[in-house]
Each structure stands twice: as structure tokens, then as C-alpha cells.
């Protein structure tokens, strides 16, 4: 569930989300290691936190590429409060870091954070910043400060063990009106700095309690929505992916007796029979003039 709204005469906007089930679904879909679960989980939470601020029918993609062993993590959200994502190396594992936590920064390494905003126009808007920590939350705050000139704070966490995802969530606070009194800015900064890790917070406190600790007072009107893991892949799209292959690759699949397309976003497998591949080959030949 995501909670979102504004504070201080609409000069500050916030969102806070708990989405254990969504991150657990991602873990199961992609058969992720513990560390990969935390990395993808953090990215999905980051993408979920911006959903209240997206334009109608907007698709927002967080794409992080780094020098670390996970190589790449991608999370996408929509204005319909859906998310999906994947990592390049779902089996990555590293020793715990010096704080005894999963080494997300080590898994990602040095690299870039790219945001793609697709509003359904001809060309999506793409912005890119260097990673400042590889922990994802700090990198998102840096992105918003530099690329969108919005002072922001993000806190994101995932707790996972042999039983699966235990806690997953985070919050985002953004100053959207620079006329906000300096004392309010300092209050928010101080309160956020004094908070424990978000995974510790969510073991004891509800989202509205966390917001009260951030702002120093009860929040007023809060809207809510359910965050869902949803992919828009289907068999027709998988078939079109096969048609992009050259004729020899399709013929090799046909000789093997089947072809398989796996969606990178949700790991759904689409299997095509020898007869279906024969039809695709015929279609490709008929429409290529060869």
C-alpha cells in the first residue's frame, strides 16, 4: 500500500510505501538470490514511490548500470500504480558489508542512473546522472536534485532471509516550493537524519506514524493506492519477438522442435511448437520477398 499527499501548504509532497508482497513476487518470478532480491526490491520501491507524481498514462523507468557483478537493475512504474523489473545477474551474492548489511553498493559498483519518462509521445525524456553511492535511495535523491531541481530525500529498505521477504518499503519527501520556511526545511532534514533504518522502522511503526515523525506533526489528507506487480507481456508480443530473428535462427528452433521466449520483466515463458515456428517462417518468407 502506498500513502501520499502534501504538507505545509502543498510546498512539500511525500509518498510512503510498504510492498513486501510485491518484492516477494519479484523474488519468486525471477528466482533471485538474497542480494539480488534486495537490489531489485530497492529499485522497485524507488519506482513505486514516484507513481503518485506521474502524468496520466506515464511510464517511468529507473535504469541503473554499474561495474559491479549485478551489472544492471531496471525497474519500471506506471501512473496506474504498477511496477515491474529485472536484474542482469539474478544469482549474485557477496559477503555482507562492514555494517553487516547486504552489499548493494558492491553489487552495483560505479556507474550511472538513467531515468526514462515515457509520456506516450514520439520520444521519451531521458536523464542520466552518475551514481553517488550505489545504494539506490541516495542515487534517486541526487537524480531529482540535479536533473529535476527538486530537493528530495529517499529512504528505501528490504529485509530478506531464508523464509523470503520480511519487510520492504520506503519513503520519499520532496520540496516542490522553494518558499518553504528554512526552519521547516531544517526540521524535516533533522527528523529524517534521526530515523533508524526503514526496515527497523517498519517493524514497529505504521506508515502514518513514520510521516508524523518526519514532519513533526500529524499529516492531514492522505491518499492511498495498492501497488501491484504487473507486466504487459503476452503471447502475441512474444511471437513478434521471434519474427525479429533471422530465418536461420527460426529454422534452427524448428529443427529442435520448439522455440521459447522468456519475458525479461516477469520471467514468463512462451513456448512455440514446431508447427507454430513453421507458420512464423512462412510468414517471414512471404513478407520479406525472399
Swiss-Prot record:
GO MF terms held by the record: protein folding chaperone; unfolded protein binding
Gene label: hslO
Keyword DNA repair found: no
Subcellular location: Cytoplasm
The name this protein goes by in its record: 33 kDa chaperonin
Function: Redox regulated molecular chaperone. Protects both thermally unfolding and oxidatively damaged proteins from irreversible aggregation. Plays an important role in the bacterial defense system toward oxidative stress.
Gene3D superfamilies, alphabetized: Hsp33 domain (3.55.30.10), HSP33 redox switch-like (3.90.1280.10)
HAMAP family: HslO
Biological source species: Thermotoga sp. (strain RQ2)
Key words, A-Z: Chaperone, Cytoplasm, Disulfide bond, Redox-active center, Zinc
Amino acid at each position: 500500500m502506498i500513502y501520499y499527499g502534501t504538507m505545509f501548504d502543498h510546498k512539500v509532497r511525500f509518498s510512503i510505501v510498504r510492498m513486501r508482497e510485491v518484492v516477494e513476487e519479484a523474488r519468486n518470478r525471477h528466482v533471485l538470490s538474497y542480494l539480488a532480491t534486495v537490489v531489485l526490491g530497492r529499485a522497485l520501491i524507488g519506482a513505486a514511490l514516484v507513481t503518485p507524481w506521474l502524468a496520466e498514462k506515464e511510464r517511468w523507468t529507473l535504469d541503473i548500470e554499474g561495474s559491479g557483478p549485478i551489472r544492471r537493475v531496471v525497474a519500471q512504474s506506471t501512473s496506474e500504480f504498477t511496477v515491474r523489473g529485472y536484474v542482469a545477474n539474478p544469482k549474485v551474492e557477496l559477503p555482507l558489508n562492514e555494517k553487516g548489511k547486504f552489499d548493494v553498493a558492491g553489487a552495483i559498483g560505479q556507474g550511472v542512473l538513467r531515468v526514462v519518462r515515457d509520456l506516450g509521445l514520439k520520444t521519451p525524456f531521458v536523464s542520466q546522472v552518475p551514481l553517488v553511492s550505489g545504494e539506490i535511495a541516495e542515487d534517486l535523491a541526487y537524480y531529482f536534485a540535479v536533473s529535476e531541481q527538486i530537493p528530495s530525500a529517499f529512504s528505501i529498505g528490504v529485509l530478506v532471509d531464508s523464509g523470503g521477504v520480511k519487510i520492504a518499503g520506503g519513503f520519499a519527501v520532496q520540496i516542490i516550493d522553494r518558499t518553504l520556511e528554512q526552519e521547516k526545511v531544517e526540521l524535516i532534514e533533522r527528523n529524517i537524519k534521526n530515523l533508524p533504518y526503514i526496515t527497523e522502522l517498519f517493524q514497529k511503526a505504521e506508515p502514518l506514524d513514520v510521516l508524523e515523525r518526519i514532519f513533526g506533526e500529524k499529516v492531514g489528507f492522505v491518499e492511498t493506492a495498492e501497488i501491484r506487480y504487473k507486466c504487459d507481456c503476452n503471447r502475441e508480443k512474444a511471437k513478434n519477438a521471434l519474427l525479429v530473428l533471422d530465418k536461420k535462427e527460426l529454422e534452427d528452433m524448428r529443427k529442435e522442435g520448439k522455440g521459447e521466449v522468456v519475458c525479461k520483466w516477469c520471467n514468463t515463458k512462451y513456448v512455440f511448437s514446431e508447427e507454430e515456428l513453421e507458420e512464423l517462417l512462412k510468414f517471414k518468407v512471404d513478407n520479406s520477398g525472399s
